[in-house]
Amino acid sequence: MSETAQTTVDQSEVDRFSAMAAEWWSPTGKFRPLHKFNPVRLEYIRNRVCENFGRNPKAHRPLEGLRVLDIGCGGGLLSEPVARMGATVVGADPSEKNIGIASTHARESGVSVDYRAVTAEQLQEAGESFDVILNMEVVEHVANVDLFVTTCAKMVRPGGLMFAATINRTLKARALAIFAAENVLRWLPRGTHQYEKLVRPEELERPIVASGMDIIHRTGVFYNVLQDRWNLSPDMEVNYMMMAKRPAAA
């Protein structure tokens, strides 16, 4: 089978998130953890992008002029605020329901986002390219991590960045991110994450580096119960984020 004939889409995952699509923008609904997670990942993205492209992170629209892909965008929780920072955003998701919810919310909020019900493979085959690709909380839901990451990396322009965030495959993550979050605290519906599909940092880095990109930064992220918010941490045993850069053209 040729690479172009393969797919990174896990239809059972698409169906699971499509069934919850109406709750994307409810801060107390099934996507509450992502609403809580948004501030720390947005700050991380903004600061790192601005550092790379020589922008002022405190500017009103610091990402003005940059083309950004939010792959696996869901209902648009990340796409919208990134667009508000001035970026030209393409939000892609294989779920028609997710894209419908995202498009409606953006229109009602007066935010311009180019939402498309497409896969990473379809975008790459169409010759799309981006200054920044956001691959956030997605790899643990795809059918082929290496192919997915490689496909995304091919669309990063010279000098551009790719961000990734996911959950580590450790016993600590199994206890906290799956058992506690889904069965005890009920923050997420049961079955949202499967332990065997979680991705270790080195497993995520391998296809990124093989695609000609350099890992520039890694960080753990932890939830502070007392503060009721997520913070960056050196501990990558559960949640973590990383940023990679494609070398600038000679």
From Swiss-Prot:
Q: Which organism is it from?
A: Agrobacterium fabrum (strain C58 / ATCC 33970) (Agrobacterium tumefaciens (strain C58))
What is this protein's gene name? ubiG
This protein's source sits in the domain of life called Bacteria
- Spell out the reaction equation it catalyses: a 3-demethylubiquinol + S-adenosyl-L-methionine = a ubiquinol + S-adenosyl-L-homocysteine + H(+); a 3-(all-trans-polyprenyl)benzene-1,2-diol + S-adenosyl-L-methionine = a 2-methoxy-6-(all-trans-polyprenyl)phenol + S-adenosyl-L-homocysteine + H(+)
Annotated membrane-spanning segments are: none
Pathway assignment: Cofactor biosynthesis; ubiquinone biosynthesis
Upper taxonomic lineage? Bacteria, Pseudomonadati, Pseudomonadota, Alphaproteobacteria, Hyphomicrobiales
The name on file for this protein is: Ubiquinone biosynthesis O-methyltransferase
Swiss-Prot/TrEMBL keywords: Methyltransferase, S-adenosyl-L-methionine, Transferase, Ubiquinone biosynthesis
Q: Which GO terms describe its biological process?
A: methylation
Function, in words? O-methyltransferase that catalyzes the 2 O-methylation steps in the ubiquinone biosynthetic pathway.
Write out the similarity annotation.
Belongs to the methyltransferase superfamily. UbiG/COQ3 family.
Q: What is its EC number?
A: 2.1.1.222, 2.1.1.64
